[in-house]
Swiss-Prot record:
Gene: dnaJ2
Organism encoding this protein: Corynebacterium glutamicum (strain ATCC 13032 / DSM 20300 / JCM 1318 / BCRC 11384 / CCUG 27702 / LMG 3730 / NBRC 12168 / NCIMB 10025 / NRRL B-2784 / 534)
Localization of this protein: Cytoplasm
Binding site for Zn(2+) 1: 178, 181, 230, 233
UniProt-recorded name of the protein: Chaperone protein DnaJ 2
Chain positions recorded as Zn(2+) 2 binding sites: 194, 197, 216, 219
Cofactor annotation remark: Binds 2 Zn(2+) ions per monomer.
Biological-process GO terms, alphabetical: chaperone cofactor-dependent protein refolding; DNA replication; protein refolding; response to heat
Main location: cytoplasm
Keywords of the record: Chaperone, Cytoplasm, DNA replication, Metal-binding, Repeat, Stress response, Zinc, Zinc-finger
Superkingdom in the source lineage: Bacteria
Zinc finger (CR-type) in chain: 165-242
Length: 395
């Protein structure tokens, strides 16, 4: 992001506080947003990652008294019309910037001309803009290529692997640092400074009343040129390679989520940092388990006698089976809870929810049939009527 874009940010809104918020309120708001949207808590959630970054950027300014003062003064000046048009098009000395002179007032003075320098105007404008937009001469540096491309791949896991977490090898083919020149692209390992842009990565051009800056055509905006290209990578600093990396999948990952591995994407050009790797997870359906958040759901068949008389049954879990006690008279369809046998979350562990379902035998031998007839007779003699309280009894 160009520093000139800071003026178009609403940092108070990004933190959800008013412009009169105290230092403590700003700190609390930032911590809350950072905790809720942290990438470790929301693996693969791009929206949460964006909110996390916006909150961090806002707190970097509003959490610093000096920066906040500069920011507030700048926003007030823009709101009052002191600078027309805002900074949507940048300013002189910024990529895509402008400068023009009307009525003896040269707006290039406001931005330190085309050199990225400080302000020389009176009235405190240098104090307002100097801190925000001139963090050092040559602010074009921020527009240079800074990292390699991001990479996305996909994997498929079983339900149990996704619920418990696992590590899995992933095969990738992409740009990797050249071992010969150690990613520099140069035989000597040291690219030369571009003479066209003097290492800034940008050149300026005047067209009448306007001045424009653009990425340097000689170096492509990097500020460096390769005068002695590496024989192996031909000056790129990267070569195509196949590699295998081990990806750690966190517990409880859900179907469709993405896991981000910082710095595991393609290598950056000429020694620049690598991009990120995003692993999209697909989870196969399981014959036994389903899930509801961090809870695991299972339906298990039981006999009528087990429900009527009570007893203990063996129930599978993510690890080893456990014994579940059925109270006498448990109704068909009842769901019983086994605490702590679900999916581990950051602050707690879910439960195993077991629903019992009567399995009615299709064929009975003579002894079983006789026993059931005897039971039915005893049931009638005891006065038991399963439809006694049924709403449709008298219809």
């Amino acid at each position: 992001m160009n520093n000139s874009e800071w003026a178009n940010k609403n940092y108070y809104a990004d933190l959800g506080v008013s412009s009169s918020a105290s230092e403590d309120e700003i700190k609390k708001a930032y911590r809350k947003l950072a905790r809720e949207n942290h990438p470790d808590k929301n693996p693969g959630d791009k929206a949460a990652e964006d909110r996390f970054k916006k909150a961090a950027e806002a707190y970097d300014v509003l959490g610093d008294d000096k920066k906040r003062k500069e920011y507030d003064e700048l926003k007030a000046l823009l709101a009052s019309g002191g600078i027309r048009g805002g900074f949507g098009s940048g300013g002189a000395g910024f990529p895509g910037g402008f400068r023009t002179s009307t009525g003896g007032f040269d707006t290039s003075d406001l931005f330190g001309g085309g050199q990225g320098g400080g302000f020389s105007t009176d009235g405190g404008l240098g104090d307002i803009f100097g801190g925000l937009f001139n963090r050092g001469a040559g602010s074009h540096q921020s527009a240079r290529p800074t990292r390699g491309a991001d990479v996305q791949t996909e994997i498929t896991l079983s339900f149990v692997e996704a619920a418990k977490g696992t590590t899995i090898p992933v095969e990738l083919t992409g740009d990797a640092p050249c071992n010969t020149c150690h990613g520099s692209g140069s035989k000597s390992g040291h690219p030369a400074k571009c003479g066209t842009c003097d290492g800034t990565g940008f050149t300026s051009e005047n067209k009448g009343a306007f001045g424009f800056s653009a990425p340097c055509a000689t170096c492509g905006g990097t500020g460096e040129i390769i005068t002695d290209p590496c024989d192996n990578c031909h000056g790129r600093g990267t070569v195509r390679k196949s590699r295998s990396i081990t990806v750690r999948i966190p517990t409880g990952v859900e179907d469709g989520q993405k896991v981000r591995l910082a710095g595991q994407g393609e290598a950056g050009p000429n020694g620049k940092p690598a991009g990120d790797l995003f692993v999209k997870v697909h989870v196969k359906k399981d014959d036994v388990f389903t899930r509801d958040g961090s809870n695991i759901l299972i339906t298990i068949p039981v006999s009528f006698s087990e429900l009527a008389l009570g007893g203990a049954i063996s129930v599978p879990t993510l690890n080893k089976p456990v014994k579940l006690k059925l109270p006498a008279g448990t109704p068909d369809g009842r769901t019983l809870r086994v605490r702590g046998r679900g999916i581990e979350a950051r602050d707690s562990t879910g439960d195993l929810l077991v629903t019992v379902q009567v399995s009615v035998p299709k064929n009975l031998d003579d002894n079983a049939a006789e026993a059931l007839r005897a039971y039915a007779e005893a049931e009638t003699n005891s006065g038991f009527d399963p439809r006694a309280n049924w709403a449709g009894q008298n219809r």
